[in-house]
Design a protein with these regions (language model features):
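Conserved catalytic cores of phosphodiester-cleaving nucleases, focusing on short active-site segments
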Residues: 41-43, 49-59
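Nucleic-acid nuclease catalytic cores
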Residues: 74-104
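Membrane-topology and secretion signals of cell-surface/extracellular proteins
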Residues: 10-15, 25-26, 67-70, 113, ...
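Mg2+/Mn2+-dependent nuclease catalytic core
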Residues: 58-76
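Acidic-basic catalytic patches of nuclease active cores, encompassing PD-(D/E)XK
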Residues: 2-32, 46
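Sequence/structural signature of beta-propeller domains
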Residues: 63, 102-107
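Charged phosphate-binding loop/patch that engages nucleotide di/tri-phosphates or the phosphate backbone
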Residues: 110-133
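Beta-rich catalytic cores
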Residues: 37
Length: 133
């Protein structure tokens, strides 16, 4: 890790890992301050299907969402995802990367990482997003 990596926030570091692991996808980083609640990433998979990913980094079980983020995912439950990187200690052989469907944001806000993810680990997440239609 160079100078930049040392000074990147945890979400920026996670985004770099996502970029590395999702090389076959087109990733568009949405830096959107005008529309609150807009997800972090617009993703186009190899079949030309789009989805969005909200990037979250969590030190504990809880995942924090703004009311705008919750509203966005309730309004757009399909092909929206929340990708979480757990920074805290995890059981052995557990991936630290989790993918959740946007339609489950209310449960995710309530239960945090206790909620079952639809995919764990970069490879499983990539396959899940590859098979969108």
């Amino acid at each position: 890790g160079g100078y930049l990596e040392k000074h990147m926030g945890p979400e920026a570091k996670f985004y770099q890992q996502i970029k590395k692991n999702f090389k076959s996808f087109s990733l568009i980083r949405l830096e959107n301050s005008s529309l609150l609640g807009t997800p972090d990433l617009l993703v186009c998979n190899t079949s030309g299907h789009f989805c969005t990913i909200e990037i979250k980094v969590s030190k504990g079980k809880k995942i924090r969402f703004s009311p705008h983020q919750i509203a966005f995912h309730k309004r757009h439950p399909d092909n929206t995802f929340i990708m979480v990187k757990a920074l805290g200690p995890l059981p052995k052989k557990t991936s630290s990367v989790f993918l959740f469907r946007g339609s489950r944001i209310t449960e995710l806000a309530a239960c945090g990482l206790a909620l079952d993810a639809c995919a764990c680990g970069f490879e499983a997440c990539r396959l899940m997003l590859e098979n969108l239609n």
